[in-house]
């Protein structure tokens, strides 16, 4: 299990993560929709996740969402690296009604994000552009490559939830055990 605490003038965050868990979660960020997405991420990846964030949500949700992405990415990095005996590459499409988002992952130590979801609009009081900020922070701190590609959908909630669930399933698959040593022709990740 990895535990990380991070405190800035904008947020105070505690994350506990067990990558080989059962999908249990205890999430409290003060941002209801974001909590719901993190619960989906834990459930469908199979990791146990606790997140507590006391952020300056009176300003807006940006610092909370971005900083949780940073800390969660660091926790995932600590749980997974050095990389060996995993599948490494995976993808998934977890549909939600009319919405479908494809996520392709490489747990290869090279941070890169291709993000192709709608950025405009609100889900209640949650700004759609924050989804990209979360994944950018997570991907770069986890040191993975991720392509998050919008395929179809009209309901913003469904599109974002499809993205989180697809990321979770792809992550579970990429981290699945494979007797391969270091999954790289370079011999190091």
UniProtKB/Swiss-Prot annotation:
Look up the EC number in the record and give it: 4.2.1.19
Q: Which UniProt keywords apply?
A: Amino-acid biosynthesis, Cytoplasm, Histidine biosynthesis, Lyase
Taxonomic lineage of the native organism: Bacteria, Pseudomonadati, Campylobacterota, Epsilonproteobacteria, Nautiliales
| Annotated family | Belongs to the imidazoleglycerol-phosphate dehydratase family.
Q: In which pathway does it act?
A: Amino-acid biosynthesis; L-histidine biosynthesis; L-histidine from 5-phospho-alpha-D-ribose 1-diphosphate: step 6/9
PROSITE patterns according to UniProt: IGP_DEHYDRATASE_1, IGP_DEHYDRATASE_2
Where in or outside the cell it occurs: the entry states: Cytoplasm
> Could you say which residues form the signal peptide?
none
Can you provide one Gene Ontology molecular function annotated for this UniProt record? imidazoleglycerol-phosphate dehydratase activity
Gene Ontology CC annotations of this record: cytoplasm
Q: List the disulfide bonds.
A: none
Q: Enumerate the CDD domains for this protein.
A: IGPD (cd07914)
One short Pfam name that applies is IGPD
Name it: Imidazoleglycerol-phosphate dehydratase
Reactions catalysed: D-erythro-1-(imidazol-4-yl)glycerol 3-phosphate = 3-(imidazol-4-yl)-2-oxopropyl phosphate + H2O
List, in alphabetical order, the GO biological process terms annotated in this UniProt record: L-histidine biosynthetic process
